[in-house]
């Protein structure tokens, strides 16, 4: 019955997504920001002008790209006739005549124009193409023409890698396929639900990829934990139904708590007050919840059907699942217990070395200059950046729109315009400052400032800060006028600054929530405190590796990123929530085993050794699976997805090795019985009992036809 219900849910979810017609958008909104205020003022003063633009770039290596011919005139008219194009500029030509472009003003964000719009652009520019000139689309059109990620290929690679690891971990096809099948069903349902949600609210284009990546990784891991415990109970002599029931009560309970922790961290992104980021967290949360539900219902149902045939179709002799018998991990845990200070120092040294580059972290926006070579967006970017002359250079790919509110001004508009134009032109980092023109009603001045550097350059960010906080207020303050920088580049820099201010808030919310959850779960103060501190170490080390690979460019070419780029502004916030949540997964599984031993009467050191020995192999297998899944998504052409994939993979590796296998056991041995201290009400004595089912709990059998056992 459970399996049938899941198949019905699968069919309904897929059908619902097809009927919903989801649409994704990377539009960000920062109500109250200076760029948003300036954009709204521009729209009111310019009869609905949006500030959304695009470039149609023409190139002729031998010159004559901007020559006035019948082909250029026909193309200009065809571009002006396109839907949602409000105006087309005169052809701007470089000094050598090899490159020229039209700037198109749009009524809507180009991203919303639909996948068929590039074909319309091709038809509109057919005349200049036939004249032998190269045509590329850039500016705001890069959102429309940028190549989509090949998520299906990444998912297949991730599934294949997971299957190999599961076969090595379990030794049999049956045991390996069950967690994988459960994860696959969960991912399809989760993605379908995300699609249904996207039909009614704006979700980022990265949302489906993020949901698939997280859902596949945690789905396989959760299924692995339940299957491992099921096999352990079979070895102990339980019949299959009882083994399935006990697996749910122990590992299943931990799966639900781990999923709750991950979801808490992801939903905590809403605390930033940024809808764009909060909804990315929502998409990932949906996939985590579905994966956890499948692990505690669908996987046990499959285990109940397979029963003792779990080791059929063996590819090697199956490894016996034990409750901590003497093996290599038991000997390793004993070694850690003998020299905890040495292991702690070594682990901290590794974390410190990986975290050192964190001090150089620079947030920014990744522009079309990082798109794949040969793509139309990258070609347009490079042609404009490499050409010389007014309107060309790197900054022409991301100019600022200057908007001045003259309401209440005590000086004439032309005097204010002249003074501000001179100040803008004299500001270091400005490549060109266009004339400021008054609106029809004389209440607004507008103009364009072109930075000397590209949109993702640190110099452009510095110029933005100088203009917003010094040049504009210092120049306009005496005239009682107010200036703003609007346009996509200004909006992205405002977005970056907002995230920088709110990231500490998100970190605080997640830390407090996770500490509270673990405190209630383990009835301890030091255990949750240690957990949140060590998980912060994992996140910091992951950030450091991101800086080295992407910002410094060390090894970025292996991932298809051939230029150093800033860290996309929202990636650290997303990574913190995800890495912290996944780190808590392994923390909960390890501490659950340690707490069971402590609850059973073992001493602290003995409990730590027992828990480590019981969970080390399965945590290692789970980490390898998660790492393989994440790295498979590094093949995406989207740099942001590459960043998330690499950052999450590194975070999992660090957490499952240095943190979980070295720092956690060594600190717990050093802290001794203080690990388990928890304030009690007067008159109560004895050990604080973690809220975890132990191995001795009498759990009713699980049957595939009757769902979860009653607790």
Question: Predicted segments — roles?
Answer:
Residues 1-3, 25, 33, 47:
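Generic start-of-chain signal for non-secretory N-termini
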Residues 1-22, 85, 108-363, 480, ...:
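Membrane-embedded transmembrane helical bundles of large multi-pass transporters/channels
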Residues 19-20, 52-58:
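Short, conserved active-site loops that position catalytic residues or coordinate cofactors/metal ions
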Residues 23-26, 367-368:
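Short hinge/gating elements
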Residues 32-53, 61-139, 360-558, 588, ...:
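Structured non-transmembrane domains adjacent to transmembrane bundles in polytopic membrane proteins
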């Amino acid at each position: 019955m459970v399996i049938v219900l899941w198949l019905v849910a699968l069919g309904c979810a897929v059908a619902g997504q097809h009927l919903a017609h989801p649409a994704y958008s990377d539009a960000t909104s920062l109500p109250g920001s200076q760029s948003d205020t300036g954009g709204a003022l521009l729209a009111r003063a310019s009869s609905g002008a949006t500030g959304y633009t695009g470039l149609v770039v023409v190139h002729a290596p031998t010159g004559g790209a901007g020559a006035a011919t019948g082909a250029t005139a026909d193309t200009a008219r065809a571009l002006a006739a396109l839907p949602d194009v409000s105006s087309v500029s005169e052809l701007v030509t470089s000094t050598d005549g090899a490159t020229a472009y039209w700037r198109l003003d749009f009524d809507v964000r180009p991203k919303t124009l639909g996948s068929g719009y590039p074909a319309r652009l091709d038809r509109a520019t057919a005349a200049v193409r036939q004249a032998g000139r190269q045509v590329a689309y850039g500016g705001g059109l890069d959102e429309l023409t940028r190549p989509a990620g090949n998520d299906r290929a990444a998912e297949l690679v991730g599934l294949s890698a997971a299957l190999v690891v599961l076969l090595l971990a379990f030794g049999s096809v049956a045991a390996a396929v069950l967690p994988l099948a459960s994860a696959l069903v969960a991912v399809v349902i989760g993605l379908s639900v995300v699609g249904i949600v996207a039909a009614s609210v704006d979700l980022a284009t990265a949302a489906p990829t993020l949901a698939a990546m997280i859902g596949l990784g945690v789905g396989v891991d959760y299924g692995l934990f339940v299957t491992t415990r099921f096999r352990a109970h079979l070895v102990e002599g339980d019949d299959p139904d009882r083994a399935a029931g006990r697996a749910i009560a122990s590992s299943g309970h931990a799966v639900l708590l781990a999923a709750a922790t991950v979801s808490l961290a992801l939903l905590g992104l809403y605390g930033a007050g940024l809808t764009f980021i909060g909804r990315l967290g929502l998409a990932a949360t949906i996939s985590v919840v579905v994966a956890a539900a499948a692990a505690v219902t669908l996987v046990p149902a499959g285990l109940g059907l397979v029963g003792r045939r779990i080791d059929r179709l063996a590819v090697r002799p199956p490894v016996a699942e034990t409750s901590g018998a003497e093996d290599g991990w038991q000997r390793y845990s004993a070694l850690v217990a003998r020299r905890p200070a040495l292991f702690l120092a070594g682990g901290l040294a590794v974390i410190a070395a990986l975290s050192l580059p964190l001090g150089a972290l620079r947030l920014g926006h990744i522009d079309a200059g990082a798109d794949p070579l040969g793509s139309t967006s990258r070609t347009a970017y490079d042609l404009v950046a490499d050409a010389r002359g007014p309107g060309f250079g790197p900054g022409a790919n991301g100019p600022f729109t200057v908007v001045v509110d003259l309401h209440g001004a005590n000086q004439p508009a032309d005097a204010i315009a002249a003074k501000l134009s001179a100040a803008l032109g004299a500001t270091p980092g400005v490549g060109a400052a266009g004339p400021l023109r008054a609106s029809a009603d004389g209440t607004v001045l507008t103009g364009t400032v072109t930075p000397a550097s590209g949109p993702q350059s640190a110099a452009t960010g510095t110029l933005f800060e100088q203009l917003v906080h010094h040049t504009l207020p210092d120049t306009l303050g005496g005239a009682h006028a107010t200036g703003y920088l609007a346009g996509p580049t200004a909006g992205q820099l405002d977005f970056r600054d907002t995230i920088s201010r709110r990231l500490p808030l998100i970190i605080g919310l997640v830390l407090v929530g996770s500490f509270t959850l673990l405190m209630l779960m383990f009835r301890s103060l030091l255990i949750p405190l240690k957990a949140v501190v060590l998980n912060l170490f994992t996140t910091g080390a992951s950030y450091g590796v991101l800086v080295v690979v992407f910002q410094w460019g060390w090894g970025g070419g292996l991932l298809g990123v051939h230029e150093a780029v800033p860290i996309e502004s929202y990636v650290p916030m997303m990574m913190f929530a995800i890495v912290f949540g996944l780190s808590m997964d392994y923390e909960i599984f390890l501490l659950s085993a340690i707490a069971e031993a402590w609850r059973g009467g073992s001493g602290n050191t003995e409990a730590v050794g027992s828990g480590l020995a019981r969970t080390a192999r399965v945590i290692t297998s789970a980490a390898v699976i998660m790492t393989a899944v994440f790295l498979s998504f590094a093949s995406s052409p989207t740099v942001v997805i590459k960043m998330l994939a690499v950052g999450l993979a590194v975070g999992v590796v660090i957490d499952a090795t240095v943190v979980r296998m070295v720092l956690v056991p060594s600190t717990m041995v050093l802290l001794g019985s203080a690990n388990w201290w928890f304030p009690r009400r007067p008159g109560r004595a004895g050990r604080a009992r973690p809220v975890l089912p132990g191995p001795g709990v009498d759990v009713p059998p699980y049957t595939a036809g009757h769902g979860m056992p009653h607790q």
